[in-house]
């Protein structure tokens, strides 16, 4: 089921691609950028990217307007997402990142709801089965990347609802 994406009105407004100097205006602008990034990545199920890929992506590059958010401004938007818990840098140079349109705790809650709803408590799953198995095809976490899945399962492990284990063909998880 593909969701359609509608660009927000700001995306068609050239000044949106220049961070504004006024503090209040800039805060609203950053909030709009953060919302756009999360919505775009959620729709495209995109969870990791480099800053250079981001700059060339339609997300920060409006070809029709011939406007592109500069790399320094993209870094500011990404840092704002990090402060909100929606982004994690994958390297110390801050050139690649994991984008989390849902925080790990939220993914964990969704996964655990499915486990409980489908009577799978006390069951063991491989990570592959959980995100790529037939049983989860209709779930939002189907197709979730392994890095985000592990963070979600670690959140569940802290709540004593799951335990990440080693199984014959890699890692797995047991739900309680």
UniProtKB/Swiss-Prot annotation:
Per UniProt, subunit arrangement is:
Component of a complex at least composed of ELL, SNF8/EAP30, VPS25/EAP20 and VPS36/EAP45. Component of the ESCRT-II complex (endosomal sorting complex required for transport II), composed of SNF8, VPS36 and 2 copies of VPS25. Interacts with CFTR; the interaction requires misfolded CFTR. Interacts with the ESCRT-III subunit CHMP6 (via N-terminal half).
Keywords assigned by UniProt, alphabetized: Cytoplasm, Endosome, Membrane, Nucleus, Protein transport, Transcription, Transcription regulation, Transport
Q: Which Gene3D superfamilies match?
A: Winged helix' DNA-binding domain. Chain C. Domain 1, Winged helix-like DNA-binding domain superfamily/Winged helix DNA-binding domain
**This protein is called what?**
Vacuolar protein-sorting-associated protein 25
Instruction: State the SUPFAM superfamilies in the record.
Output: Winged helix' DNA-binding domain
The cross-references to InterPro entries, in alphabetical order and at most eight, read: ESCRT-II_cplx_Vps25-sub, ESCRT-II_cplx_Vps25-sub_N, WH-like_DNA-bd_sf, WH_DNA-bd_sf
Provide a GO CC annotation, any one.
nucleus
GO BP, one example? protein transport to vacuole involved in ubiquitin-dependent protein catabolic process via the multivesicular body sorting pathway
Instruction: Please state which protein family the record places this protein in.
Output: Belongs to the VPS25 family.
* Domain of life of the organism encoding this protein: Eukaryota
Summary of the function given for this chain in its UniProt record: Component of the ESCRT-II complex (endosomal sorting complex required for transport II), which is required for multivesicular body (MVB) formation and sorting of endosomal cargo proteins into MVBs. The MVB pathway mediates delivery of transmembrane proteins into the lumen of the lysosome for degradation. The ESCRT-II complex is probably involved in the recruitment of the ESCRT-III complex. The ESCRT-II complex may also play a role in transcription regulation, possibly via its interaction with ELL.
* Compartments, as annotated in UniProt: Cytoplasm; Endosome membrane; Nucleus
Q: Which organism is it from?
A: Bos taurus (Bovine)
Report the GO molecular function annotations.
protein homodimerization activity; structural molecule activity
Is the keyword Transport in the record? yes
């Amino acid at each position: 089921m593909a969701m359609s994406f509608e660009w927000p009105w700001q995306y068609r407004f050239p000044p949106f691609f220049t961070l504004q100097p006024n503090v209040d205006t800039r805060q609203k602008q950053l909030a709009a950028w953060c919302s756009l990034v999360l919505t775009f990545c959620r729709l495209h199920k995109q969870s990791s990217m480099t800053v250079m890929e981001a700059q060339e992506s339609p997300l920060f590059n409006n070809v029709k307007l011939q406007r592109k958010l500069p790399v320094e401004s993209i870094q500011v938007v990404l840092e704002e997402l990090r402060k909100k818990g929606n982004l994690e840098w994958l390297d110390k140079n801050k050139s690649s990142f994991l984008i989390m349109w849902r925080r790990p705790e939220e993914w964990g809650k969704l996964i655990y709801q499915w486990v409980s709803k489908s009577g799978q408590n006390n069951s063991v799953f491989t990570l592959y089965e959980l995100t790529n198995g037939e049983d989860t095809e209709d779930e939002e976490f189907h197709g979730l990347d392994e890095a985000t899945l592990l963070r979600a399962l670690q959140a569940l492990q802290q709540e004593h609802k799951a335990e990440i284990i080693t199984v014959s063909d890699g890692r797995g998880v047991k739900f309680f």
